[in-house]
């Protein structure tokens, strides 16, 4: 059975269980030493060292609260299992994606709009969380913490040596690719053997060429993917003219290695790939720019998503202690500890350093010209990454038409219940007017 269908089943169990047990099972209990225990479960095992440092500093400075932060492997599976058993942590730390949407839809999170720190979050990231709500809800249910960005990585030394300039429009981008190609250098490396890599340029193009609430508009029946994704599909295929021969024979690691060795001038992938690239070439001078998807620079949008955010469980018995933890986590010094370890962009307004590799994206970050990854709204069982790869492999004259038609039909198939729910809500709102 598909993962999302499983969780929808769990949501019904959770709703019944909460009604029957009064939201029992939360971790905020008194310890033997009299301190209130607050448990945070994070889905990022790669950040365990940063969280260990933060946990230690918190416990050294608080006499009445003991903080435990765990970052297990397979955290999402563990969390879903715990939710079924009604053994809830106090706070969970997850990304702004479809899992957040499902948990919120299951009514697991408490409204934290009365937390002062919410007022210090960059508006773009608050908007992203709102767009992840299946049905609009009053309140705020997550505290965005750290974000990532995806566009096009480029070899800064190669650009400088050849006098190439970072493009700001689609025309400038294709002209640059032609110039690089004529110089004997490969403009792009794609590495589409691993299907998930197809989503990197797809998302980066889509945020600039479509509205950020496209998926919700489709659910409401106001548009179709065949209409809105047409320019995205066209420009995805255009990338193939500037990439390695048969990109489906090379995976993510191959692409990172090739780019690290100077075999391509650019790599359309997120900043998360930089550590892998630098493991091959530690001295590589890497930059990253916003995908110039449009004919006018002013229409471009940076693809940025919430990599980590904190939500207080509705089952939490000690909201005051949970808030004290969130306040500490949102202190500038604490945020910097996390960013120094994990990189990325602070979701909080303030004077936080932007990684040098993302410097070209600074104007977009500082001016909130950002939109979430489209695939954060896609159900996993729809396998959009594989659909994109299949489309790109298809050389028939009507390949794009078939792809977009399938996108619409599969969307209805895998989102039937959600579409009905959204349209019922829409009708209720219209009837109430």
Kindly give the residue locations of the regions a language model identified.
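Mature extracytoplasmic/periplasmic domains
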Residues: 57, 108-111, 261, 272-276, ...
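Hinge/lid segment of periplasmic solute-binding proteins
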Residues: 95-150, 174, 180, 200-203, ...
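Extracytoplasmic/periplasmic solute-binding protein
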Residues: 137-145, 150, 174-221, 264
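Conserved C-terminal helix/tail region of periplasmic/extracytoplasmic solute-binding proteins
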Residues: 160, 336, 369-433
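Glycine-centered hinge/linker elements that transmit conformational signals in sensory
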Residues: 179, 218-248
């Amino acid at each position: 059975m598909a993962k999302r269908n499983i969780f929808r089943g769990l949501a019904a169990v959770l709703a019944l269980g909460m009604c029957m047990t009064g939201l029992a099972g939360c971790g905020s209990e008194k310890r033997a030493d009299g301190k209130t225990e607050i448990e945070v479960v994070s889905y990022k095992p790669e950040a365990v060292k940063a969280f260990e440092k933060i946990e230690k500093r918190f416990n050294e400075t608080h006499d009445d609260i003991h903080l435990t932060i765990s970052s297990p492997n397979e955290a999402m599976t563990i969390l879903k299992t715990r939710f079924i058993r009604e053994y809830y942590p106090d706070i969970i730390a997850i990304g702004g994606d479809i899992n957040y949407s499902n948990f919120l839809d299951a009514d697991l999170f408490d409204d934290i709009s009365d937390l002062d720190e919410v007022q210090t979050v960059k508006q773009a990231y608050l908007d992203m969380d709102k767009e992840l709500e299946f049905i609009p809800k009053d309140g705020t249910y997550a505290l965005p913490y750290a974000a990532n960005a995806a566009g096009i990585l480029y070899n800064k030394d190669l650009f400088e040596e050849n006098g190439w300039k970072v493009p700001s429009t689609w025309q400038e981008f294709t002209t640059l690719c032609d110039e690089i190609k004529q110089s004997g250098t490969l403009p792009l490396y794609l590495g589409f053997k691993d299907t998930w890599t197809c989503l990197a340029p797809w998302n980066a193009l889509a945020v600039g060429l479509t509205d950020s609430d496209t998926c919700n508009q489709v659910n409401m029946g106001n548009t179709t993917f065949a209409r809105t994704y047409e320019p995205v599909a066209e420009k995805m295929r255009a990338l193939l003219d500037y990439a390695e021969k048969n990109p489906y024979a090379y995976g993510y690691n191959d692409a990172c290695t090739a780019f690290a060795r100077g075999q391509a001038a650019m790599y359309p992938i997120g900043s998360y790939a930089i550590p892998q690239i630098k493991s091959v070439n530690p001295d590589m001078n890497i930059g990253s720019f916003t995908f110039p998807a449009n004919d006018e620079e002013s229409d471009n949008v940076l693809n940025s998503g919430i990599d980590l955010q904190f939500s207080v469980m509705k089952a939490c018995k000690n909201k005051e202690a949970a808030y004290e933890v969130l306040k500490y986590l949102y202190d500038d010094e604490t945020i910097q500890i996390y960013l120094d370890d994990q990189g990325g962009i602070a979701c909080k307004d303030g004077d936080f350093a932007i990684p040098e590799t993302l410097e070209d994206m600074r104007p977009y970050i500082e001016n909130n010209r950002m939109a979430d990854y489209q695939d954060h709204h896609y159900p996993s069982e729809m396998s959009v990454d594989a659909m994109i790869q299949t489309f790109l492999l298809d050389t028939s004259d009507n390949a794009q038409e078939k792809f977009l038609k399938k996108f619409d039909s599969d969307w209805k198939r895998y989102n039937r219940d959600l579409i009905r729910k959204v349209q019922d809500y829409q009708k209720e709102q219209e009837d109430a007017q």
